[in-house]
Amino acid sequence: MMIREYTPADVPAMRALWRRVFHESEVFLDAFFRLLPDIGSAVVALGESGELLGAAYALTGFEWQRRDGTRAQLGYLYAVAVDEGARDQGIGAALSKAAAELCRKRESAIVTTLPADGPLYAWYEKAIGTRYLLCREAHTAAARKTVDIMKLTGTEYMLWRENLLRGRDFVRLSYPMLEAQRALCEAYGGGLYATEDAVLAAYRDGERLIVREILCARGDPAVSAASAAAALGCSEAVFFLPAESGGEPYVTADAPLSPGTVWNLTLD
């Protein structure tokens, strides 16, 4: 087996593997692979005949912005995938280590990831040393339209977001990374939105609206989340807020991020 950084010639096989493992929307995959050179890179594992055994993505379009003005680039491991016939051979761990190292070579000070489920937090800690957590709290709101919702472009959302997060520790997204976030939301029936008091990024999951980020100037986030759910034909909204203590595990990192750091917009 050989692990190396991907080349454009690898993309068709990488897309096919992604579809088999994650059953992802073609709309999102089109956008993701178009944006990949601007948001990071990837590593691939190849068999003896050059066949693709697995892939992992090393994304670097995130910057930790602290209220004291200091900044640090974050690397983010995403979509580690191994073909079914090549599993249980340590390929996933090897790809994760290679992707983490690629993040560091691309000047990331901290390597992070969002494990898909609970047992994977320990798996990633063993593989790449990610033992520090950001946590969040989940909330629900029944659909009820009390404020108007308007759709935003990526540029509009970025400007609103930066303004609402001024004076807080937060993770800034590069514009191409924000476009990847928008593509993910729109591929599943959502997008980037604003009310008179808030901005939110959301997508549909059946009858639920999954609000991946909601930022309010002063009001109750449940009001805007409920209105967005009603506007998009959902029965309820599930939204998440950063937790300074307690809450459910969210992003895990190989160095500590300040409690309450606002990230929200990872790639799920």
What are these regions (language model features)?
Residues V44, E51-G61, L74-Y76, A81, ...:
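Conserved beta-strand in the GNAT
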Residues A45, G75-A79, D117-Y121, Y132, ...:
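Core nucleotidyl-transferase/polymerase catalytic module
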Residues S96, C103-A116, G233-P242:
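Conserved GNAT acetyl-CoA-binding A-motif
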